[in-house]
């Protein structure tokens, strides 16, 4: 994720602040007014999303959450209280420092890389080495470590295994 793009939803002024400070010059930042376009681009182009949570847009959180994408929620702590976060989500209470934001972005990038490296595609199945699960569509099966190791061995083998 060295060429990371940060999608900002819910606060256009923050994009202007980032551009003015040039703190995140190694990242590209884009503001979105349209929720669907923000989610579509985040999924298609592997963007990290900064979602500024307000009382008015708090209900959009579930749409972001259902997409399983890297997301940083930024809000006053009262707006973040009852939001259950997934593994690819972080939250920042306002006010926050730019150093704190940069640290949170770095942590989330590391989580995404770790998650991406733990997934193996095997035909129509996805093997998650960390969670020791195999998934197909909406079905998932918990496996033992030995079963996971066998599946990984099979996935790496070019020839049939006797």
Regions found by a protein language model. Name each.
Residues 2-6:
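Extreme N-terminal starter segment of soluble prokaryotic enzymes
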Residues 8-33:
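Two-component/phosphorelay signaling modules centered on CheY-like receiver
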Residues 33-47:
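Acidic, metal-coordinating helix/loop segments flanking the phosphotransfer/catalytic sites
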């Amino acid at each position: 994720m060295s060429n990371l793009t940060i999608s900002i939803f819910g606060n256009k002024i923050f994009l202007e602040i980032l551009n003015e400070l040039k703190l995140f010059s190694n990242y590209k930042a884009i503001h979105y007014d349209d929720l669907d376009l923000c989610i579509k681009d985040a999924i298609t182009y592997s963007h990290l999303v900064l979602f500024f949570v307000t009382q008015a847009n708090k209900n959009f959180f579930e749409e972001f959450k259902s997409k399983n994408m890297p997301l940083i929620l930024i809000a006053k702590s009262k707006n973040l209280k009852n939001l259950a976060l997934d593994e690819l989500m972080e939250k920042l209470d306002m006010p926050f420092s730019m150093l704190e934001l940069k640290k949170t972005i770095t942590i989330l990038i590391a989580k995404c890389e770790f998650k991406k490296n733990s997934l193996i595609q095997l035909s129509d199945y996805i093997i998650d080495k960390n969670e020791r699960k195999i998934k197909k569509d909406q079905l998932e099966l918990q496996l033992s470590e030995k079963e996971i190791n066998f599946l990984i061995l099979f996935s790496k083998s070019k020839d049939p295994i006797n």
